[in-house]
Amino acid sequence: MQLIPSLITQLSPWRLVRLALAAAGLPGLLSAQKIAATAANPPTPAEVVELNPFIVDASRDTGYVAAETLSGTRLKTEVRHVASPVTILTEEFLQDIGATSFADIVEFMPGTETYRFDDSDLRGEQAHNGRTFSARGFRADNQSRDFFNTGIPLDTYNTGPISLNRGPNSNLFGIGSAGGALTFGSRPGRLDRATQDLELKFDSNGSQRYVYRRNQPIVPQKLTLSFAALQEQRNGFRRPEGNDRTSVTLGAEWRPVRHTTIGLNHERGELKNLRPYQFATYDWTAPWIAAGRQLTTPVPGSSADFTPPNSASVPRAIESLGNSSFIRILGTDYPIFEYNRSFGYGRRTYLNGVLERVSVADSRLLPLETYTGGFGQVNRTSFDTTMVRVQQRLLPGLHAELAARRENTDGRDHGMLGSNEQAVYIDPNPILANGQPNPFVGQPYIESATNRVTLSEDNNEAWRFSAVYDLALPDYRIFGRRLGRVRLSAFYSEEESASFMRRLTQRVRSGGGNLRHRLYLGGQNGWYLPDGLKRDYRQVRGGVGVPSVDTVWEEGTAAGDRDARGNKTNALSFVGHALLLDERLSLIAGYREDENTSETFDPGAESRKVAKNGAMTYGAVLHLSNWLSLFGNYGENFRPAGTGRVGIDAKHLPENLGQSRDFGLRFALFERKLFGSFTYYDTKQLNQVRNSLGEIINDFDDVWDTIEYAYSTLSPATLAAARLPASPPTRPTDDATAIYSRNSAENNGNPGAIFADTLDSRSKGIELELIANPTPNWRLSWSVSQHRSTVTAARKTVMRYYAEHLPTWQRYVDPAGTIVAPLSTVFIQADMRGLRLADMLAAIANGFDETNAEIGGQRYGNREWSSNLVTRYTFREGGLKGWNVGGSARWRDKALVGYAANPATGFRNPSRPFFERGYWTMDVFVGHSRKIFRNSVTWDSNLRVRDLNHPKVWTSVAAAVDDGFTGNAYPTRRVLMASTSVELSTSFRW
């Protein structure tokens, strides 16, 4: 059994494809006498599609209703026979929502929404990659093209069918999110006719989009070539914000003989994304104004910190810079200034001195849509990808496919602003660093952080072999119905990737410090950093007539500044699909086994890990009648934890597992003009990675240090008198606390960044979908979704560590919680806090109690209910013939943003949640279609108004409680809702 896989793994995917292409000619040699007859009477496209289980026939779709899908078993299956929850977006539906990219699609599917943040990504960094969304309350970033994982964002200019699978499904993807996955195929070529189309789109944000496609048969019904090109400049509603893309796709479809299909697809392109942080800009000017506009007393050349006033009558409103900073003042001729610690800046906003980041910049100070990072937050990615597939009917009922894909990307990420630094500051310094009077004293400004460039390279190769056999069961009858048929399939795949990253920081050569860029607001400066920062430069000029300041790009040496990763996954799966009793009963079952090997070559976390997992998916559909069906499905998948982070015990984290149970019914009413489904689901995600452990590592490290310090000062006699061991307990040498102590200096004081923990969560709810074609002219789609996402377990690895070592620590604390006499002067933390060991353990236990108090409560950001409506009506006769009107509406329930505190414990109380109001938005469009140039060209035009009812408003996605004072909730994160925009598109097809 090991012989074939071992031989296969010795071949590269491209050698396999070359062998397959050579083998593709074999049927032609064996069937030479049949070729002439085939050429004389070529099969129709419908006949060929029906014989090929790897391709669906989109021509069978009606309006928004899809007839076939690959997203049940990876093979062509009628949608009504699929047991797992799947939504298929037809071409008409995509046109009516005006979708061209992933971002346009995600808000229109049931149970999904735009991703904001989650427990392992509090800053929302993953929202920028163009493929992350939230499904059933879980973060999902699985996108596959032709069932190969891809990191290139979806665009409809070169894609075919698009499907959303909700919940885990190992038949489709063994490695992925519990929320589901988005799958799409390459746009197929046509062998029967030549086609061309040209699309143009513009909007009121200044966006432009141009698409040209051509399909040209070279040998009718045998060979066709296709070409597609995209040029897009897509601006967002924030300023500045944009996603630009230039792509070219070449394709070929070759059918040398009737039962052989060879396909080739190659895409090359470049992405440029200017990605604002999604959260509102904070206001750090209000406290300074409220406190009486305090000023610093800076001393140029001094190394002393500025000590701000702070008393009951004089609130603290300014802070020392803390470190020497090189600052370039944009829009002036000033040289680069080196500000020392005696200079200051306006303090962050605090509510009652407790809550931070509760105030956003007033629109009069900074327009709402302005992004303070300006053009300094740009990502450029060049990519190329090639996919080859050979599909062959070997024998009647037996088909095989061999496919390979290669994808390479090179990225350059320019970052100048952290999400916590997205703020409007105030300048309280009466003089400049050169001692001259400061003309900007008392003025607000925005400032970039360290200028950094991250260079990355990702190379991915994958191949798979698929075999499927359709078996007709004996012609027995049960309950008067034929037994039916069975489809058996097997898939073997390998995927190997290598990624490299290094981070460069721009520093001033002479002083070695980081260079920051400051822009004072108002006047002629505009509102954000100027166009000059679009460029990467090695010298920063101070202004006209001022000598340049020499800078150098330094490569970081800390953990996370350099990284090389390797990843390889082998997967073998078997799927069976039985259609029984005259297709009244559909049974699907599959098992998949993945072996994932990941390696990390990082200065802070070099390691190798092998993860193996078996997952199954099985389900059934019972057609009670021609209009009513019942279905049930169970699915699993997993995601390797990888080597980038480890638990507090310095061991690899457990694998992330997904499990889901789905039950429901489907119906087709009114002569199949109304289709619908109702689903109840219960989805779990186990061992989700959450944030770093810096704080808890500190706490545990303090406990070990305190005990070790005490033993270093006590005599054997004292220990014996206290009935304590003669030597201290052995601290694990390879756990996080030991590594923290050893590597703190090596990792910029934050080795905790490589340590993480896990949590479990669960989402339960319902999904209702209705799709109708009431008349040949009217299309309608409506969905309602509910999900209640809760945390079921948290801090799992830390709690195990705590339970293991707590008995040892408690030996040094008596039952009353005081320090063991006579050691009360020794078992005290050897730092400025001077905490007793008992106090430390009590604080740790209190933190765990607070975590446990939240278990069972809804997760932050959860919007329990949502609904989507899309409709279009086309006039086919009369004076309005050729016109169409339609629109869409999306409603989102209130969002959970925090919890009130329990007065008795001070912990957050899940029974007292705080919510942000819900919202709804609406799009409308009017279109026209007509034939021109003697009916040889179809001309379509469309005018769309997006977010018709949306002014520029913030909505809160997180809040904190002012526990010690009012007990009220105050927003700590706000997201700006998209404002109204107008879009004009036109297309020509011939």
State the predicted function of each range:
Residues P640-G644, I819, F827-I828, R859-R934, ...:
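C-terminal beta-barrel architecture of Gram-negative outer-membrane proteins
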Residues N158-G160, N171-V248, P256-T260, D384, ...:
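Outer-membrane beta-barrel translocator/receptor signature
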Residues A290-E369, I426-N451, F500-R565, E695-A756, ...:
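Flexible glycine-rich, low-complexity coil/linker segments exposed to the extracellular/periplasmic environment
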Residues A66-V79, A83-T87, I97-P153, G160:
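Extracytoplasmic beta-strand/coil segments of soluble accessory domains associated
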Residues Q2-G111:
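N-terminal Sec signal peptide and the immediately downstream disordered periplasmic leader
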Residues F138, N149, T246, S313-Y339, ...:
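Outer-membrane beta-barrel transmembrane strands
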Residues K272, A280, E494-M501, R518-V544, ...:
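Surface-exposed extracellular loop regions of Gram-negative outer-membrane beta-barrel proteins
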Residues K684-N687, R788-S789, S888-N902, H928-W990:
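C-terminal beta-signal and adjacent terminal beta-strands/loops
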